[in-house]
Amino acid sequence: MVSSLLPNPPSAECWAALLHDPMTLDMDAVLSDFVRSTGAEPGLARDLLEGKNWDLTAALSDYEQLRQVHTANLPHVFNEGRCAKQAERELPQPGHKVERPCLQRQDDIAQAEKRLSRGISHASSAIVSLARSHVANECNNEQFPLEMPIYTFQLPDLSVYSEDFRSFIERDLIEQATMVALEQAGRLNWWSTVCTSCKRLLPLATTGDGNCLLHAASLGMWGFHDRDLVLRKALYTMMRTGAEREALKRRWRWQQTQQNKEEEWEREWTELLKLASSEPRTHFSKNGSGTGGGVDNSEDPVYESLEEFHVFVLAHILRRPIVVVADTMLRDSGGEAFAPIPFGGIYLPLEVPPNRCHCSPLVLAYDQAHFSALVSMEQRDQQREQAVIPLTDSEHKLLPLHFAVDPGKDWEWGKDDNDNARLANLILSLEAKLNLLHSYMNVTWIRIPSETRAPLAQPESPTASAGEDVQSLAESLDSDRDSVCSNSNSNNGKNGKDKEKEKQRKDKDKTRADSVANKLGSFSKTLGIKLKKNMGGLGGLVHGKMGRANSANGKNGDSAERNKEKKSKSRKGSKEESGASASTSPSEKTTPSPTDKASGASPADKGSGSRGDAWKYSTDVKLSLNILRAAMQGERKFIFAGLLLTSHRHQFHEEMIGYYLTSAQERFSAEQEQRRRDAAAAAAAATATATVKRPARRPEAEGAPGPERASPGPTAAQPTQLVLKLKERPSPGTGASARAARAAGGAASPGPGGGARRAAPGTGGPTPGRSPPAPARQSVIHVQAAARDEACAPTVGALRPCATYPQQNRSLWSQSYSPARSALRTVNTVESLAPGGADAPGPAEHKSQTYSNGFGAARDGLEFADADAPAARSNAECGRGGPGPAQRRCQRENCAFYGRAETEHFCSYCYREELRRRREARAARP
């Protein structure tokens, strides 16, 4: 294929030029080309192509813009898509790391294999296979809805490990890009920021083969992927032949738009059913031949992407609520929202009685057309923090409750859709939604600490406040109740006129309040909220006004009396809230009343029957309603959340975690060792490069005074180049980093003699507390020996003195001295003294080596341990004024330095060693 010939596509335009065929292509082929070229989720690819009328070039351009805007805050990807991954395998790059940007899953086929081979699922294939078999046997005992044990997976406590190992595990298991994107959008872990008693939830890395929804659900419960397609097959079976099939279909059709024709509904339902199949996706090539198993036969099978209705069906299979954390809009390169994301919200198993369901929800994350499991982390003190999932967003607005309405078996599509009375009976009020949440979950109100509690929510402008949302909500709720409680068939026209007048009156009141608030300066926002609260808000006179209007329109006295009661109760909402909060601990949970849970009535029947009396719910529901209304008005003192039960685990949980940690430790050690080898190789390469360039600069160094010649090494210009090369690399070890940090700070470093090294520029003689000359000269010897040994066997330890040596030489050339450099030079030099011989001066000799302004002062303050050194010094003084004589490579074998005729073509160090050897030979003669 054309895509396999491109190792690294630079942009979407290049892909468009190569993949776009001017001929009319089958939609499946176009979709396949788009997915193959970008690695995007098929669901996102289909949306982009449909938005551009299946124009591949335009869709690829939009995708490129989306990728660019979302990679601003995330690491950049150098190779995108499945084709780039194939080319990457052919041309491996050492140290190359690929991370997923915001709009491209890191879980294309190649990356999925990499992830799955390192995750908990593959820590021990025997243990995981045994666990899968056990789960499959449990699932086969039930017919269609799998009787799932209430398992909730938790990550092990990673705080007990070192920071490096913890970071390694987090990169291995956690979907970093998803976590960053959702946290920045304010959708994930905002509750742990405002309330420290709440645990953070972390998205687990999930493979992206089209089955990510069920993989994520399996990971969230058991810790392994749904490789055996147990959940996928159960999903398909329930949608095809399950007892709840018709009711689920009605709920799905009700939530969809009413724009489809009758024959289109069946076709849409058939397509939806086909998506749930466990059969891999089939792609048709341009010549009409079909290929199964993804893009080509060599890859793993790719399944059809699932939609939000499949999440709702999955909740019935698991018999437990599902909460999906997702952003609400997909945005283009300019930040403008161009497509909604409908997945976020709450999915309840409404076709199963609450007393037969698990109350602990399964929590999933959805980002970039990809699902991930959201799990918490174990802690030593489990009582200190609790695992919860808020049922509101960060603005304390209730999350969407998906597919909550079932019109019933007797609903006639196309006829009853125009009956306003029947439509009004199907509208769920806020109280009804809260009652469903209390029935299916263990909900709790978590108190927000006063120190992290946000001040009273202020409107962004005097004309756009939270009160408007509350007021519109109150209007819709009251209108729904009025439609239910009144005889709307007889008073339809009259009620419509009265409601229109009432709405105009409220708009006038709100406008008056805003105009007053605008004139009051800094006090306008708070006063504006209070005026709206009294004139048109949820906690003010709105219920009283509606009650009086209903009474004037001929409504019965019971309705007016009920509205008055609602008015008084809403006015007392803050008092009830404060009273309840004083007696409620942060961990205390409010549960539905026993009568609600004991009743086995269908939720649909319960919902329709409850609308006749909006206040028949339990006290917990009314308390939740009052607190939620107060939160929407700005008094945000609590978080409305569902409790996550993490105490139930399957019997193979501990074994899986143990095997994974053992495997991760081995891989971590291997990775660290590989990094050390790479660092040593890079250091050797840098040293070799510097050595090759050294001869061109050597005459300048040889023309310097004797003290400089006593330190064989590169010149002042060349060491700077070497230092820059070494600084571009990371430190090879923590010890070197610590020493470099101490050196940079000017700290004194203990030398071989045990004393702290300190020096001041400008001193010319011996000074008490000054470092002895031996350690300084030893560091020079150590550097040369290390440089000589690196050619044979480069080691990590050889990098450290080599990196400090040019700094010493540079300090001599610039006629300045730094105590930090002195401290850095003298580290780890004792072990290099052994080859120096017994005559080398020890640390106890009180000889000073001082660096000061001027070469003469520095020369006068230096002494040498051997007798022949002054001769070399005088020779250096003779050649000081002009360029040095011709030089050649040192005569000693394997020595990388250069010598001159005065030193018999030995370098200065080898020359001293040769003189010492001769003296010893003469002394040994009889």
From Swiss-Prot:
One Gene Ontology term of the molecular function aspect: cysteine-type deubiquitinase activity
ZnF A20-type span: 884-919
Region annotated Catalytic, chain positions: 185-452
Region (TRAF-binding): 170-413
Pfam families: OTU, UBA_8, zf-A20
Bias kind Low complexity: ranges: 484-494, 579-595, 680-691, 731-750
UniProt entry keywords in alphabetical sequence: Cytoplasm, Hydrolase, Metal-binding, Methylation, Nucleus, Phosphoprotein, Protease, Thiol protease, Ubl conjugation pathway, Zinc, Zinc-finger
Modified residues (Omega-N-methylarginine): R880
Positions that bind Zn(2+): C890, C895, C907, C910
Enzyme class: hydrolase
Domain of life: Eukaryota
Cellular component terms per the entry's GO annotation: cytoplasm; nucleus
Residues covered by region (Disordered): 455-517, 540-615, 671-779
Membrane-crossing segments per the record: none
Cellular compartments annotated: Cytoplasm; Nucleus
Biased composition (Basic and acidic residues): 495-513
Residues spanning the signal sequence: none
Function noted in UniProt: Deubiquitinase, which cleaves 'Lys-11'-linked polyubiquitin chains.
Family: Belongs to the peptidase C64 family.
Xref: PANTHER family: OTU DOMAIN-CONTAINING PROTEIN 7A, UBIQUITIN THIOESTERASE
Name recorded for this polypeptide: OTU domain-containing protein 7A
Species in which this protein is naturally found: Mus musculus
Phylogenetic classification of the source organism: Eukaryota, Metazoa, Chordata, Craniata, Vertebrata
